[in-house]
Amino acid sequence: DFSEMQTLHFEGGALLKSIDFAKPFFEADLVVSLSKLKTHQLMAYTGAMKNLFGLVVGLNKAQMHYRFYDKKDFSKYLTDLALASASQYAIMDAIVGMDGPGGPGNGDPVSLGFLAGSQNLLALDWTCASMVGYNPYDILNLSDALSRKIWLEDPSEIELVGESQQSIGQLKFRIVTETRGVTSLQKMLPGWMNSIAKKIFIKTPQFQHKACIRCGRCIEICPPQVLNFQDEQKSKWKKKDKE
């Protein structure tokens, strides 16, 4: 049951000192990340470390995307999450992966034909990302995790046991090279236009007054919690400082 959450306090986070995980996390003897090798529209690649985002309950995921809308900040958040989870093992299912620009939900199935596992989640992701054609340094959450020097000091420390990449052969996999999001746009704009771009391209909820029956459900499920009823006649934004 992942409907309830509980707060975990931890040390060493770059952005967070506490994080809310699903209650079963606190009842488990160990954490194993069972991940599928996929492309990702925002992060380019998703694997063992990104998979731990599944420990976050329901709408809290959307809240974290809203809070850390910049991809660099979201990458740091993912590293904090992996650190807090203290996952002891990870298995990567790459028998059939997902490639193309639609990942992780609307990409295309691609036969890769291998399984991989490691006690070191970053080492596993670094290796698998390399095998399908990525430069892991270009994957923001992996490069951030490497910079922390918690899982690895240097990729050269990674030791492969079992089938070599050469024996598996050249894998046909369409990587994501251009990710979506405000951060991607910022690279093409002068600094003074960044704040304007954020206002234009960050999605914001709006009431549909003609369809509204004032049930209040949208207020309950709004990830940034910025909606409220103003009076008996109409609904509008509730001003809230962004964290």
Features from the language model and the residues they span:
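Extended, low-polarity segments enriched in aliphatic/aromatic residues
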Residues: D1-Q208, R217
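Short pre-active-site segment immediately N-terminal to redox-active cysteine/selenocysteine motifs
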Residues: K210-A211, I221
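Iron-sulfur cluster-binding cysteine motifs and their immediate structural context
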Residues: R217-K238, E243
